[in-house]
């Protein structure tokens, strides 16, 4: 478990943190099944994933609040980006977050526990350790407490990034680039 990991934050969808990550990584959250422990009507998973920083997920129960991200198979996960805005959300802003990973809900292990101080923008949580990506079927983000002892939480967006892998890395056949072979690449 890592406490108080290296966290960077910024505030727009076109900000440098997001652009730098998207150059070398791919957003894999779209392949997952998302669920939340509770939500106010009109502030659910759809708002958490709609790429609109004006909408948000709002919990509606006692803490801790959970966001569960389940992939159909084990994935290599590099970064988790969470967007919070203290200026807009005040006591709804999370201040203590736990990230757990595993294959199913019953074998989750805490990998990161971090405390945030008035976060405003994208919070980049690296999930690769010693140059090895986290490999998991399931991620769970737990909000343990909010600023100013708030009860419900607001999170505006979450993005999950994995390695960008080219298909050439998975083919077992060598590349044939000689003129003799290229003559037979197409049919007339």
UniProtKB/Swiss-Prot annotation:
It is found in: Nucleus. Its main location: nucleus. This is Anaphase-promoting complex subunit 10. The APC/C is composed of at least 13 subunits that stay tightly associated throughout the cell cycle: anapc1, anapc2, anapc3, anapc4, anapc5, anapc6, anapc7, anapc8, anapc10, anapc11, cdc20, cdc26 and cdh1. InterPro entries: APC10/Doc1, APC_su10/DOC_dom, Galactose-bd-like_sf. PANTHER family: ANAPHASE-PROMOTING COMPLEX 10, ANAPHASE-PROMOTING COMPLEX SUBUNIT 10. GO terms for cellular component: anaphase-promoting complex. PROSITE patterns: DOC. Belongs to the APC10 family. Keywords: Cell cycle, Cell division, Mitosis, Nucleus, Ubl conjugation pathway. The lineage of its organism: Eukaryota, Amoebozoa, Evosea, Eumycetozoa, Dictyostelia. Component of the anaphase promoting complex/cyclosome (APC/C), a cell cycle-regulated E3 ubiquitin-protein ligase complex that controls progression through mitosis and the G1 phase of the cell cycle. Residues 4-187 form the DOC domain.
């Amino acid at each position: 478990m890592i406490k108080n990991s290296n966290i960077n934050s910024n505030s727009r969808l076109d900000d440098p943190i997001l652009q730098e990550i998207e150059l070398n990584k791919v957003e894999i959250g779209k392949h997952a099944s998302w669920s939340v422990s509770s939500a106010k009507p009109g502030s659910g998973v759809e708002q958490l994933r709609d790429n609109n920083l004006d909408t948000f997920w709002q919990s509606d129960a006692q803490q801790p609040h959970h966001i569960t991200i389940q992939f159909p198979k084990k994935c290599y996960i590099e970064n988790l980006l969470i967007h919070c805005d203290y200026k807009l959300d005040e006591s709804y802003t999370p201040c203590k977050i736990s990230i757990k990973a595993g294959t199913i809900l019953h074998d989750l292990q805490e990998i990161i526990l971090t405390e945030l101080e008035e976060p405003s923008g994208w919070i980049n949580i690296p999930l690769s350790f010693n140059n090895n990506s986290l490999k998991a079927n399931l991620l769970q983000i737990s909000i343990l407490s909010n600023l100013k002892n708030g009860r419900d939480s607001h999170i505006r967006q979450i993005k999950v990034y994995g390695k960008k892998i080219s298909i050439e890395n998975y083919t077992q056949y060598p590349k044939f680039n000689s003129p003799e072979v290229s003559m037979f690449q197409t049919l007339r």
